[in-house]
Amino acid sequence: MGDGTEFVVRSDREDKKLAEDRISDEQVVKNELVRSDEVRDDNEDEVFEEAIGSENDEQEEEEDPKRELFESDDLPLVETLKSSMVEHEVEDFEEAVGDLDETSSNEGGVKDFTAVGESHGAGEAEFDVLATKMNGDKGEGGGGGSYDKVESSLDVVDTTENATSTNTNGSNLAAEHVGIENGKTHSFLGNGIASPKNKEVVAEVIPKDDGIEEPWNDGIEVDNWEERVDGIQTEQEVEEGEGTTENQFEKRTEEEVVEGEGTSKNLFEKQTEQDVVEGEGTSKDLFENGSVCMDSESEAERNGETGAAYTSNIVTNASGDNEVSSAVTSSPLEESSSGEKGETEGDSTCLKPEQHLASSPHSYPESTEVHSNSGSPGVTSREHKPVQSANGGHDVQSPQPNKELEKQQSSRVHVDPEITENSHVETEPEVVSSVSPTESRSNPAALPPARPAGLGRASPLLEPASRAPQQSRVNGNGSHNQFQQAEDSTTTEADEHDETREKLQLIRVKFLRLAHRLGQTPHNVVVAQVLYRLGLAEQLRGRNGSRVGAFSFDRASAMAEQLEAAGQDPLDFSCTIMVLGKSGVGKSATINSIFDEVKFCTDAFQMGTKRVQDVEGLVQGIKVRVIDTPGLLPSWSDQAKNEKILNSVKAFIKKNPPDIVLYLDRLDMQSRDSGDMPLLRTISDVFGPSIWFNAIVGLTHAASVPPDGPNGTASSYDMFVTQRSHVIQQAIRQAAGDMRLMNPVSLVENHSACRTNRAGQRVLPNGQVWKPHLLLLSFASKILAEANALLKLQDNIPGRPFAARSKAPPLPFLLSSLLQSRPQPKLPEQQYGDEEDEDDLEESSDSDEESEYDQLPPFKSLTKAQMATLSKSQKKQYLDEMEYREKLLMKKQMKEERKRRKMFKKFAAEIKDLPDGYSENVEEESGGPASVPVPMPDLSLPASFDSDNPTHRYRYLDSSNQWLVRPVLETHGWDHDIGYEGVNAERLFVVKEKIPISVSGQVTKDKKDANVQLEMASSVKHGEGKSTSLGFDMQTVGKELAYTLRSETRFNNFRRNKAAAGLSVTHLGDSVSAGLKVEDKFIASKWFRIVMSGGAMTSRGDFAYGGTLEAQLRDKDYPLGRFLTTLGLSVMDWHGDLAIGGNIQSQVPIGRSSNLIARANLNNRGAGQVSVRVNSSEQLQLAMVAIVPLFKKLLSYYYPQTQYGQ
């Protein structure tokens, strides 16, 4: 705006011309208005009489027409209005009533327009509002709109009923029918016109001819009644058409521009400077008393009113310095026409959330403010509503003097569509609803207020918070306690939030200053990430999830640059870093590099740090304290020493804990195994897993050359760093028990020959200056910790909720191992073989078989030459006889062996009953000569095509030592020349000559894996046919060791049936599994037997169930007869997944020297295998079968597509 103020006044000649132009168009709607003329006559008379008559009840008619409003500072608003009524205004009212009647009958248009303005730049009150004057209307209504601030004083007409708005059609403003005759007024939704049945807010009338200025609250002058006339006639103008409004504005624009300047000057000459000062001071005090800004759209929706939008048309005067805003009632048609002409302009700025709207009834009870907020620049929107309390009463008084105009002239205040006032609650943030419950019930079809076309919705940040419902007032008195409590809680929360935001802003400034000192810009990746996290934390902590304004970063960056440029404000920041790591990785050298001076002596051949010590210094003006610790050792055997060192470190930092932990390791240390896990777990056990939450991984020797890749080419430096970082980060996650950890990694190079830049800073091969980056990471971690403590955010780390997920134990594997049948250990004299249980079945036939072999005639074997002379039939008979005799001989030998075992068993029992001395003599006599070690035969090795196939191998000896040590042959191992990949050792111990203990172990090692197996077993007999065994197994399962303790009891419940029951407990990793099994073996005969077993295994609430069935059918003379068939069935249920598998294996003799072996297996998932094998010692032509795969391979070379089945 300019410094001057313009008023545009329309002459009577123009008024008549406009009225004549509109007569022809108004005849169209004349018939519709005739129906409501009689009703409107009565209502308008009542409104005018109430508006003027209510003031006469308290005070006589004003006698002094020249009294000004400045003398009524302490009087109510009603008294001020009375004193301001002069005789020429009364006469003008009568003339206005007559003009209104004429206009109503002739459908006349708008009369004069008076503009009042307020200048914010030169100390004069300027209001860029062009209001219509309504001649003859005795209802009062006023409204003002400006770019910055419009304030309006309201007159209250007391009635006992609540104010309501009447919408004749239940539609929007453009469709309402309003008639004004005989000085009576009908109100409709959103136009602000008073209803004669209720208390209404009416605006004082300013006559157009006299030019007398009558200031209202805060120096605001009330517009003429033309505004109300224009608002009432909106419906008529819409029905008449769009042209009327356009013609009206076109005809009056030039004259308004010309006449505006003089009228404005005349009006403001009569307004004293004191009133201007009073008005501005009142506005300032109202703002300071905690007013609340109400959004027009949301208020209209809550009150259920239909508001009329007022569009401001900007008119520039001849000098070009001032702007006059013409306020007209805008219907949808008028909005479109004004948009086409391009007449609607404006300057709408965003309203800050701190700007609230309310009145302070105790300090300044006579003032009210009107604020407007528009979501679209260039257009000022205004919606008029009757504003009242719940019972329809207002206590509005005239303003008091205030002398603070100069402080408010430069501020910009938006125009708010709500007129709010509160007369009994001091600094009340809520705004009283403008619609009473009676109005809501009487007008259920009310629509939301229509906004002018082109106006967008305001920013969500500028919308006020939802207000608490208010209780109805009785006789003008509200529930003061309830409002006061709500105000106190809201104010306290707002103050706390503002204080937190300020502190967080200071943290931002501090971090930006740190980055500036380290030579890092705000666009650095680490800086940007920290600022993003701070903003995100503030948003999560803020009220109602409101987002942080973008100005926070800009303001913080500018403040940081100013403080660093001035160099007067010291930086209140210090950081303590504790360095941990293995011995020799460069901890002390890194500390020396950080301070750029020798703080600790280092030696490449001796251990540098032997005790915990700290050092302080300044780095770029920042106070840094570093704690150096002795080197740690990674092996398992050194963990006890590491615990002593770490406990001393823990005691040292007890009083002053570090802010950051820097764990150092070497970049060029290639280790993909878990060699560092013992050390990391020890650190976690001593300090707790939380030590890794603020840890930074530093990799020294960062200028190392990357190793060669798999194909011999050099790998990239970035890939080398990434792989090494991933290994260390993964190990730390496992040691901390939190797989979410992602510790940042920083590279370090302490060598004096490291490449440097122009500033003398050491640069890594990837171009990074490592020292500022390391310090920035350390400072960022502390800054985030400070913000976390300020915002009181939870870390969600109570103990170890995210413990490392250990692998679930393989329950099916453990259960199948449990179900396997194991032989029980026996004493040396009882090592008779596995067929002891069959001795009883064969005793009945021993006598017959013995006599059968002895009764055979003598038989003489033939030589090869003699057999060559025999015919084919003779040769067959000879071979059959030979085979029969051999079978009978083998049977006889087996019988003799069984008899010998029985005799030896009886003899051993008799020796135990004899005296000890006699038994020793018997053993000495029966003992033979000392055994001589003999070479053991070599194990068969697979064929090898290597040229260095050894012809000589050192053999092991069979000695008399009780330890049996043998090599372990692996036919498919990597060392196919030797085939020995492990060693096996066995020994049998006897405790008290009754309890056998068997110990066996095996170690297998190749280039990658190492497997260990250890088995210890013992058995005790406690009755005939009853025994109990106890065993301990240790074996490698994956990369962990599984320890199993098992026990089994066997007993013979029938002569041909044996039962067994067993338990097992397995410890694997950090899980314990327990299992139970039951087994039954039934021997039907020498040729058929069946074994059934079932069991269950559980761990961590998980269960696995399984069972096996094995049936064996063999030759009656087995093992002399080679026929054998085995049928197996297994069932496993784990996690509801049922696995069923079956297998069959059969061996059938074909002729005298050939066997056919067939195998087949199938499971319930459709997977299976079938194999057939034939071996023979005579039919060598079977080797021709090998031609088949060779022929197929040759075909694949000529027809490659056959290889893929195409």
Curated annotation (Swiss-Prot):
Its cofactor is Mg(2+). Residues 607-611 are annotated as: G2. Expressed in seedlings, leaves, flowers, and roots. Its EC number is 3.6.5.-. Residues 403-427 have a biased composition (Basic and acidic residues). Residues 700-703 are annotated as: G4. GO terms for cellular component: chloroplast outer membrane; plastid. Residues 628-631 are annotated as: G3. Gene3D superfamilies: P-loop containing nucleotide triphosphate hydrolases (3.40.50.300). Residues 325-336, 430-440 have a biased composition (Low complexity). It is an enzyme of class 3 (hydrolase). Residues 13-33 form a coiled coil. Keywords: Acetylation, Chloroplast, Coiled coil, Cytoplasm, GTP-binding, Hydrolase, Magnesium, Membrane, Metal-binding, Nucleotide-binding, Phosphoprotein, Plastid, Plastid outer membrane, Protein transport, Receptor, Transmembrane, Transmembrane helix, Transport. GTPase involved in protein precursor import into chloroplasts. Seems to recognize chloroplast-destined precursor proteins and regulate their presentation to the translocation channel through GTP hydrolysis. Probably specialized in the import of nuclear encoded non-photosynthetic preproteins from the cytoplasm to the chloroplast. This is Translocase of chloroplast 132, chloroplastic.
